[in-house]
Amino acid sequence: MTALQNDTFLRALRRQPTEYTPLWLMRQAGRYLPEYNATRARAGSFLGLAKNPAYATEVTLQPLDRYPLDAAILFSDILTVPDAMGLGLSFAQGEGPRFAHPLRTEADVQKLAVPDMASLQYVFDAVSEIRRALVQDGRQRVPLIGFSGSPWTLACYMVEGGGSDDFRTVKAMMYGRPDLMHRILEINAQAVTEYLNAQIEAGAQAVMIFDTWGGALADGMYQAFSLAYMRRVLAGLKREHDGQQVPAIVFTKGGGLWLEALADTGADAIGLDWTVNLAEARRRTGGRVALQGNIDPTVLFAPEAAIREQVRGVLDSYAAAGGSDGHVFNLGHGISQFTPPDNVSVLVDEVHRHSRKLRAGQK
């Protein structure tokens, strides 16, 4: 096992003391970076990028070479799992993901099966290659995060056949044929568990479950159709590898109503979107979990002084409820492709600067 130069992120997830608040950014390797766009052009397509371990490694490291971030996250897509199930994933320019074979009928659902993880070997190869590429002067620069979509979020795409404004197709199935919905979710939960465990075996040092569309569910439906299946995944995860604890983060966008329940899933940390007050979230979760988040990504379009002010507000809010440890700074959702890269430098600088001051007892 290669020692880490910077383990601040992992210590924060374990709610241990840190010298400053670590940060990484959702979609930190992405279209806002010109170097990413150059690599994607060489790859020829998004899937050409995501399915090539050398390209995936290259783009994973790009934001780390530009900014002093405290974690790397595997470059991939949440829809690799349903693609491996045979649903026929494609990305049309400017249109987002599409599945050629969405799950619409009972027969479609009956045919669904957990994919052979060998069909996702390109993901695990990328994890291993990124781990090797992170080593500098005999030590690994920062930890590597692996990830998956939640069973419910994957099901949304699998039934709708792509993105949706109202999720009426998947919700109609949920309300009208809950038996079919539960079968999809059971298969997805098993697949996600195996997928994340394979990432851990390949070298992921923390994992995150993205429940992007959990917040589209009504109270009661969320607990039955999203939370229950994330809990099942978490119960099946390898939580130790190479003698090291592997922390797990869960993030339900729009999930502020259910923080107490999320804190009881067995996750080490909860990701929060920008609608949640951090001090209040900390009180509600009772210090049982670390918290990750949660600045509004559009703050990055503001002038420098405003970015710094908003960063301080997030850090101060968390610290007001009992000190700064146990917090990973992040955006409340993925970074916009239109974000000026220089503004990200301002955000990263202010997070590190102000969080050090807070720990030193200064304002």
Swiss-Prot record:
InterPro entries: UROD/MetE-like_sf (IPR038071), Uroporphyrinogen_deCO2ase_HemE (IPR006361), Uroporphyrinogen_deCOase (IPR000257). Keywords: Cytoplasm, Decarboxylase, Lyase, Porphyrin biosynthesis. It is found in: Cytoplasm. Belongs to the uroporphyrinogen decarboxylase family. HAMAP family: URO_D. The gene is hemE. PANTHER family: METHYLTETRAHYDROFOLATE:HOMOCYSTEINE METHYLTRANSFERASE RELATED, UROPORPHYRINOGEN DECARBOXYLASE. SUPFAM superfamilies: UROD/MetE-like. GO terms for biological process: protoporphyrinogen IX biosynthetic process from glutamate. The keyword Lyase applies. The lineage of its organism: Bacteria, Pseudomonadati, Pseudomonadota, Betaproteobacteria, Burkholderiales. It comes from Cupriavidus necator (strain ATCC 17699 / DSM 428 / KCTC 22496 / NCIMB 10442 / H16 / Stanier 337) (Ralstonia eutropha). GO terms for molecular function: uroporphyrinogen decarboxylase activity. It catalyses: uroporphyrinogen III + 4 H(+) = coproporphyrinogen III + 4 CO2. This is Uroporphyrinogen decarboxylase. It comes from the Bacteria. One of its GO terms (cellular component) is cytosol. The record marks 77 as: Transition state stabilizer. It is an enzyme of class 4 (lyase). Substrate binds at residues 27-31, 77, 157, 212, 333. Its EC number is 4.1.1.37. Catalyzes the decarboxylation of four acetate groups of uroporphyrinogen-III to yield coproporphyrinogen-III.
